[in-house]
Amino acid sequence: MLARQTALSRNLILTIVLLLCLLTAIGHTAYFYPHLPARVATHFDGQGEPNGFSSKIEYSLLMLGSQSAVCLLFLGLGPLVKVLPVSLVNLPNREYWLAPERKAETVKRVNFGMLIMGISTLLFLMAI
């Protein structure tokens, strides 16, 4: 019982951290918005030369949209394992891990991994 509570509280804490990362990303975008040039390079060729540009509002909306999408994606993928048919879940030995006696623990572990990846991805997007 204690292990179950620990896993639940761990995933709840990570969910809160992921949402805090999203709020930080929104604040990050809002903070740097006034400092952006009117035309922002958004695409680069193989030599690193810019070949695509957007207005600073388009760029900011793109950043906010992609960061929000990443957050929603990683929040939703973990619990989705619970309701998907076993044939749609790509895990090694999925019949073993998604057997009724192990499915709840597997879902918690997958959710944990998705939350960690979501946090890491949002932090990466803020850094670039």
Language model features: what each stretch is:
Residues 85-105:
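Juxtamembrane inter-helical linkers in multi-pass membrane proteins
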Residues 1-8:
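Short, Lys/Arg-rich, polar N-terminal cytosolic tail immediately upstream
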Residues 13-18, 108-123:
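Select subsegments of transmembrane alpha-helices in polytopic membrane proteins
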Residues 29-61:
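Active-site and channel-lining beta-strand-loop segments
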Residues 49-57, 101-111:
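Membrane interfacial helix-start motif at the N-side
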Residues 21-24, 121-128:
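Membrane-embedded alpha-helical transmembrane segments of multi-pass integral membrane proteins
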Residues 9-37:
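Short, basic/aromatic recognition patches
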